[in-house]
Amino acid sequence: RMMGTQATASCGAVIAHHQAPLAAVRRELHAAEQRAKNEGGRDAFSITIIKRSGGALRLTANWGEPVALLNDLRAFLAADGVSRRAAYHTLEWLDAQTLPAPEGDGAMLQSLLAYQLDRQAGGPAKAQAAPLALRLTAQTLNQPAAQRIGWLRNFISVAEFLAREVRTSAAEAP
């Protein structure tokens, strides 16, 4: 029996500290899977990152471009020419309390993102700043208006967390 062309895939993933209680991690995993099914429309992924400090990041998005963008942003943030503080500087001004929710074509958001990413990059990575800003803005505008800034903050934070591991692994390589 085949699943057919209408089959969907939902996936939940949790990244946790090795000393995090396993029962809590399993609960988060179940919650992530449910978010992927409910918030993502039964064809999505949901990543939860449980920080050592006790906080958590949660990102839910559809398959396709958001996955590719997450990987590309992670690679950008891990690149040699990009400041390790790039994500933090971007998150500093990306505040839902002071920044209006992006509307229309999101030109203001795109311009601010491109400027900030470009400022924090050097070498070959600098050329990626504007295209990444364009793609980040497009994905942000796909979110409900009230959740756009929060979703973008989580997206950037998750990419930065994943980039840390790449930077650490590269620094330890002989």
Residue ranges and their predicted role:
Residues 1-174:
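Charged, helix-rich terminal subdomains or tails
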